[in-house]
């Protein structure tokens, strides 16, 4: 193993549930043979982590220090003896399990180098990779009507990619600031999703009773899934990009059958696909084809991470993505 410097302790966030998180010191771990240790610059706060912060009976508390952070980026400071494709000092994005911390260990195969062209940019690789993977599995082509339900970080970037592919994006959100962001990213139609029946009528005014060729559900709630089913046309593709974690869902299978829908769970779990998505996202950002910068709306010091989660829970006007400063 090669090590840059010698450090005895590091700092991490410890989640105890019921909106309680504290700062703890942890011993520095050494990477195994095919691992790297990264000195983190930052980590995105993922909406899927909100229930962990709020507290749920099915979670076991306290979480491991740094968990469930998984959107980290920073510089490699130690490598395992079988890692030959990466070097100490490389700036990387990664998928790792405990990135709400100053340091985390990642598998070498879950790490992507960040080019020098993005030296001054935050790069939360995991959600950026999710966007690209969702887009790939959505099979978007020019001229399609694409309804995107939920314009958060994922929904806004998916809007950009769909518009770039020549699709006509119908953006649906409860928040006016989210619809404004969708318009900035190229959406051709903006619809408030305060009432499901009203939203469905407005969409059908645009694309007719035949419905949309593609519907991307990016909320993770039952009502959004119900609306997605109503908007999808015959032989359409309904793409589930929202993270559903608070219990089983019910769907209108008769409608799905009658419409002949292709239903896609767009969350990749194959590590190789995770990495592929991150690599492609970083390339798109590096060339200017994708710009997430307007969505990085809040930066929070690690010691104040609870503030970031309160913002995520309340979603003040203009909020899209909070990044934790892990330095």
Give the location of each predicted region.
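C-terminal hydrophobic helical "lid"/dimerization subdomain
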Residues: 2-8, 226-229, 234, 276-327
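Glycine-rich beta-strand-centered segment in the early N-terminal region that forms part
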Residues: 27-44, 56-98, 117
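NAD(P)H dinucleotide-binding glycine-rich loop of Rossmann-like/cofactor-binding domains
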Residues: 78, 92-149
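Glycine-rich adenosine-cofactor-binding loop
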Residues: 144-163
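Adenosine-nucleotide cofactor-binding segment
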Residues: 148, 163-227
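C-terminal substrate-binding/catalytic core of Rossmann-like NAD(P)-dependent dehydrogenases/reductases
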Residues: 200-201, 205, 209, 247-297, ...
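ADP-ribose/adenylate-binding Rossmann-like module
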Residues: 231-248, 264
